[in-house]
Amino acid sequence: MGILNVTPDSFADGGRYNSFNKAVHHAREMISEGVDIIDIGGESTRPGAERVSEDEELDRVIPVIEELADEGVRISIDTMRASTARAAIGAGAHIINDVSGGLADPKMLTTAAELNSPYIAMHWRGQSKDMNSLAIYNDVVLDVISHLKERISAALEAGIKHENLIIDPGIGFAKDAHHNWEIIDHIEEFVALGFPVLIGASRKRFLGGDTPDGREAASVALTKRLSTTGIWGVRVHSVKPHKDVFAK
């Protein structure tokens, strides 16, 4: 899953692709490198980020989705809003990637069920501006699994089909470096829940390095490690190095 942030303030690439032409060009580069899914987001979820308006989010993502809809690659919409998810699916997206797991918008789960779209539910403890203060756990693996089980139940009760549900333990969201590594060390326990597992760890601070770009080698090494664990996918900034790992 290749990341396409059409935002000015995402942690790793904010501002690089926040115009229509730059976003579409980068998406086509990822397609040429063999990306399976392009995850398009118009609202940063980095720690400390403020929400943007619905209109701003739609203005950022819908034209890009419409342009890429016929490129032969699956598109996911990275959003916490049911209205944005509905508009994106209508514009040609295929998957809803909701970092809040349906908690930010009470209409999201029923909307995903109605649209019959694959839905990614992530472990989430609150808005981005508050997440650093929420990284407190008794046992991070057990706590995150317990939370995901609750979101799985809520999603299924809302009408989302079992085969449409994907889970994400939320690496870097209300978690410190130790928490992130604990989850990675026990990722098979998440796979054992019986749903596809997505991991989004690309270029995040816990990997070390002074800058996001400086964490790329560590990101690829982590993908190599995860490639044998049975996870469904990795969400990454650079497609080719990660594809090469899976090809070996």
Cite the ranges covered by each PLM segment.
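Phosphate/pyrophosphate-binding loops at sites that engage ATP/ADP/AMP, CoA/4′-phosphopantetheine
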Residues: 32, 73, 151-164
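Hydrophobic "anchor" residues on beta-strands that sit immediately upstream
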Residues: 1, 35, 74, 94, ...
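N-terminal glycine-rich anion-binding loops that anchor highly charged ligand groups
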Residues: 1-2, 29-40
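Short polar catalytic/cofactor-binding loops
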Residues: 5-9
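Short, conserved structural micro-motifs that define repeat-unit consensus positions
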Residues: 39-41, 74-75
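Active-site-adjacent loop and "lid" segments of alpha/beta metabolic enzymes
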Residues: 12-21, 25-26, 45-67, 71-74, ...
